[in-house]
Structure formats: C-alpha cells, structure tokens
Regions:
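Structural recognition of alpha->loop->beta junctions
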Residues: 172-182, 239-263
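Short, acidic loop-to-helix structural element flanking the phosphoryl-transfer center
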Residues: 7, 101-155, 159-168, 190
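Active-site neighborhood of HAD-like aspartate-dependent phosphohydrolases
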Residues: 1-45, 51, 57-60, 64
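Alpha-helix termini
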Residues: 69, 145, 219-228, 266
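Substrate-recognition "cap/lid" segment bordering the active-site pocket of phosphatases
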Residues: 125, 129-134, 154-206, 212-224
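Glycine-rich phosphate-binding loop signature in dinucleotide/nucleotide-binding domains
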Residues: 148-151, 199-203, 265-266
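Non-catalytic pre-domain segments flanking phosphatase-related domains
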Residues: 1-8, 30, 68-109, 260-267
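Acidic, Mg2+-coordinating phosphoryl-transfer loop and its flanking beta/alpha structural elements
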Residues: 207-253
Length: 267
C-alpha cells in the first residue's frame, strides 16, 4: 500500500474546538431549552453515531429531539436524519436559520453573526468563543510525515470559508495547500475530498478526521474511484473500537500518534 498524501479535517484534528464549537453547541441548546440534558458526552455520542458533522445541523437536531412528544433514547435519536427529527418535533419556537443564528452569536460573537449571516440579534455576545480555539498541529509532525514519503497535504473541513480563513493563518501548513470548505460540499459527500485529492494527484491518501462522517466520506470516495484511501480517526479511547468496527484503518488519541499509526497500516 502506498500512501503519499494526508488530508486533514480541521475541527477536532488540526484545531481543538472544544471551547468554541462544542461549547457553542451546548450554550445554544441550553439557551433554547434551559433544562436540556446536554453535555460533551452527548455531543460525542451524536457525532460518532450519525450525520452530525455540521454543528448547525447538530444544534437544530438536538433542539428537535428535545421537542418531540415521544422522547427517543439519545443513541437512537442520533441515528435519525435531521428531517426525521424535525418531522417528529412539535411546538418548535425557532426554525433552522434562527438556531443557526444563535449558534453563530455564541461562536463568532453577535457583531460578526449579524454582519456575516444577517441573523437577528438575540444574545448580545461580545466575546466570541472562537477566540478560545487552540491549534494542535505542530510543524514537527509534517517533518516526520515527509521523512516517511508523505509530503502532499490537503484540508477538507466542514467550516464555511470565512470560518476557515479566520483560523488558517495560525495553522502551520505550507502555502498553497488545497482546501475544501462547506461551500464545496458537505461530508459525507465525497465531492470535497475528491476536489482536494485531484489537486494533490497522490498515489494513495490517508484522511484524518474525528467523526463518523469523515469516515463515511473516505469510504464513499474509495468506492467511487480507483485511488486507495484510508481513514484515521482521532477519538477518545472509549470510542476507538466503534470506529474500527465501522471501517477506520486506525484510531489515534492525538496528532502526534499519526506517523506510528500510518506505519502500522502501510507496513
């Protein structure tokens, strides 16, 4: 097996977004439903169980689930589609775009949310949670990958372009790295991955992600083409076996473990 390219997800892989995106999901859902049993464990459950790579979808899906007359077990609800959860909900006080706006006020701050998305001002947040994001990629990792013959790098993120642009300068990737954002297609659609891979023209690619949709995107890309593609998932220890059973080539706790994981897979 030849792997000479790595395509990174951003949130949860290159950037620690626990204090930004994840916290924004929690605050958004609690703003909508103050007594909601929302915590990080629940969010992790949903992200590894279904089509919840996009945090706008996740917020609205959780909101719909909480407003269903018949309460589904959270693990069961996580495997439903957004349309199914919305159809089962009743008495929703806010629609998708309104929930998106509340999330953006928390994450990017009210001023940016209003200017960028035209949302209605509701929470007056002057300090964006996005300020608390921490870059996890270290330059030494890229040196180690290059020593293994892996020098082609790309990015496929669920972020919109404006959110990518505001963090990109802090991530130590080479200039000119091909990037696909939400505007290029949503995971698990393989189109954004295909766009990046075509720019890299590799012999084989490893996708590094942190959600079920990253894995599904990679699998869909591999099934549709002739290029070998594997997915390595960054996750906690208690999630590892679930991702391996779903088809991940390997799981890692941190980016620092990536070279060893790839060596074990490539042989």
């Amino acid at each position: 097996m030849t792997i000479d390219a790595v395509v990174f997800d951003v949130d949860g892989v290159l950037v620690d977004t626990d204090a930004s995106y994840t916290e924004s999901v929690i605050r958004t859902v609690r703003w909508l439903a103050p007594d909601a049993p929302i915590d990080r464990a629940l969010i992790r459950l949903w992200r590894r169980s279904g089509d919840w790579n996009n945090d706008w979808d996740l917020c609205y899906g959780l909101y719909c689930w909480l407003n269903a007359p018949t309460k589904l077990d959270p693990a069961v609800a996580a495997r439903k589609t957004l349309a199914e959860l919305e159809a089962a909900a009743s008495g929703l006080g806010f629609g998708y775009r309104e929930v998106q706006g509340i999330f953006e006020e928390h994450d990017n701050g009210t001023a940016v949310a209003v200017a960028r998305y035209g949302v209605t001002r509701r929470i007056d947040n002057e300090r964006p949670l996005a300020l608390d994001e921490r870059v996890m990629l270290q330059p030494g990792l890229l040196v180690e990958l290059a020593a293994m013959g892996i020098s082609k790098l790309g990015v496929v993120t669920g972020r919109v372009r404006s959110d990518w642009d505001q963090i990109a300068g802090r991530i130590p990737l080479p200039a000119g790295v091909p990037v696909s954002t939400d505007e290029d297609g949503r995971k698990p659609d393989p189109a954004p991955l295909r766009r990046v891979v075509e720019a890299l023209a590799p012999a084989g690619v490893a996708v590094v992600g942190d959600t079920l949709n990253d894995l599904r995107m990679t699998q869909a890309f591999f099934r549709a083409g002739t290029l070998h593609a594997i997915c390595v998932i960054r996750c906690d220890v208690d999630e590892s076996e679930l991702y391996l059973q779903a088809g991940a080539a390997a799981t890692i706790r941190s980016l620092g473990e990536l070279p060893a994981a790839l060596r074990a897979v490539i042989g």
